[in-house]
Amino acid sequence: MANDNGIKHFIDLSTVPATELRAILEDAKARKARLKAGEVERPYAGKVLAMIFEKPSTRTRVSFDVGMRQLGGETIMLTGSEMQLGRSETIADTAKVLSRYVDAIMIRTTAHERMLELAEYATVPVINALTDDTHPCQIMADVLTYEEHRGPIKGKTFAWMGDGNNVLHSLVEAAARFDFNVNIATPKGSEPKSQYIDWARANGAGIMSTTDPEKAASGADCIVTDTWVSMGQEDHARGHNVFIPYQVNANLMAKADPKALFMHCLPAHRGEEVTDEVIDGPQAVVFDEAENRLHAQKAILAWCLQDRGLGA
């Protein structure tokens, strides 16, 4: 998404045109190949990425830090307690100040609205590294992972099991942008937000919703799940018993296509949303997903910065 000043923000998959998302994905593949071949790239030497964390993270922090460094740049980490974002200083003022110091801002926050407001007032690119509503960087890594293992994602069917959370919201947006289908199995009361489903369907995604996990898994090309309780939402969590039928185990995987993959953004609660047998099994690609956060996010950083005359 570009604002009125031509700044490219990576807000959601719905805010970036399909052609540009595909270009980012292909760039990620190319950058990964060059890295594996031992090539060194430093297009953003001297550039700085501010990383704002209101929610703790392992994969997001390390992958963005390493990615920016591999591109030649540097990072500075700011925690919510250090910044008091939107409390002691307005988000608008914070955005304007940070824009004078750094070349891009990455934010992992609890509130989607805070991320949107930061992007509204920043004069450098803002990247959504996770909000309670969406997780677009993760899904770009997932699409990359699927295509590495199984080829073009177009026309394939993903089956989601469990809570209708932020990862699912970005998955259905990706379905519209990359032309694949999503079967959603959630217990009543845990459905995804309707605005994301409505947008995906209006933009061509095939979305099926059910309370029956076996129906959703039937013939699917990929089974996806996440923790039953998202980080920071423990006080509002439903009892685990309602999710037990949605556990991804060998019996559920057997309902999918024999070549189906298993995905999970991690960290996983083994024995809850997924069994050891599945997550450690041959169909699981969870650690490839984790690695591909690095490559996808490097391509996202490059997409945000390229048109600002900051390297390639």
From Swiss-Prot:
Entry keywords, A to Z: Amino-acid biosynthesis, Arginine biosynthesis, Cytoplasm, Transferase
Enzyme class of the recorded protein, top EC level: transferase
InterPro entries xrefs: Asp/Orn_carbamoyltranf_P-bd (IPR006132), Asp/Orn_carbamoylTrfase (IPR006130), Asp/Orn_carbamoylTrfase_sf (IPR036901), Asp_carbamoyltransf_Asp/Orn-bd (IPR006131), Orn/put_carbamltrans (IPR002292), OTCase_ArgI (IPR024904)
SUPFAM superfamilies: Aspartate/ornithine carbamoyltransferase
Main location, first listed in the record: cytoplasm
Binding positions (carbamoyl phosphate): S57, T58, R59, T60, Q84, R108, H135, P136, C137, Q138, C265, L266, R293
Transmembrane segments: none
Pfam family, one: OTCace
Binding site for L-ornithine: N166, D226, S230, M231
GO molecular function: amino acid binding; ornithine carbamoyltransferase activity
Subcellular location: Cytoplasm
Gene3D superfamilies named in the record: Aspartate/ornithine carbamoyltransferase
Record-level GO cellular component terms: cytoplasm
Pathway involvement of the protein, from the record: Amino-acid biosynthesis; L-arginine biosynthesis; L-arginine from L-ornithine and carbamoyl phosphate: step 1/3
Record PROSITE patterns: CARBAMOYLTRANSFERASE
Catalytic activity: carbamoyl phosphate + L-ornithine = L-citrulline + phosphate + H(+)
Family membership noted in the UniProt record: Belongs to the aspartate/ornithine carbamoyltransferase superfamily. OTCase family.
HAMAP family the UniProt entry points to: OTCase
Function: Reversibly catalyzes the transfer of the carbamoyl group from carbamoyl phosphate (CP) to the N(epsilon) atom of ornithine (ORN) to produce L-citrulline.
Protein's UniProt name: Ornithine carbamoyltransferase
Lineage: Bacteria, Pseudomonadati, Pseudomonadota, Alphaproteobacteria, Hyphomicrobiales
Gene symbol of the encoding locus: argF
